[in-house]
């Protein structure tokens, strides 16, 4: 299961854990993803999307219908 936001495209970034002694070990910074059900009034059904919290704010701002049409235009099967 990929850790990618379907709306924003956010994916894991890499970096270092740095201890007090400045020892560095590699780590991954994971996006804040949630599987969320959105009610789509035009289709009269729920759509389940894996989105980050930023993606949820974009859906709140633009509307689920606009975001879904953009995703379908990009080739996502939803």
Curated annotation (Swiss-Prot):
GO terms for cellular component: cytosolic large ribosomal subunit. The keyword Ribonucleoprotein applies. Keywords: Ribonucleoprotein, Ribosomal protein. It comes from the Bacteria. GO terms for molecular function: structural constituent of ribosome. GO terms for biological process: translation. The keyword Ribosomal protein applies. It holds the Pfam family Ribosomal_L28. InterPro entries: Ribosomal_bL28 (IPR026569), Ribosomal_bL28/bL31-like_sf (IPR034704), Ribosomal_bL28_bact-type (IPR001383), Ribosomal_bL28_sf (IPR037147). Belongs to the bacterial ribosomal protein bL28 family. This is Large ribosomal subunit protein bL28. It comes from Francisella philomiragia subsp. philomiragia (strain ATCC 25017 / CCUG 19701 / FSC 153 / O#319-036).
């Amino acid at each position: 299961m990929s850790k990618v936001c379907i709306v924003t495209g956010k994916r894991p970034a890499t970096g270092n854990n740095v201890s007090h002694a400045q020892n560095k070990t590699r780590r991954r910074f994971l996006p804040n993803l949630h599987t969320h059900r959105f009610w789509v009034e035009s289709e009269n059904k729920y759509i389940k999307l894996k989105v980050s919290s930023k993606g949820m704010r974009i859906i709140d701002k633009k509307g689920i219908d606009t975001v879904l049409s953009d995703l379908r235009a990009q080739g996502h099967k939803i």
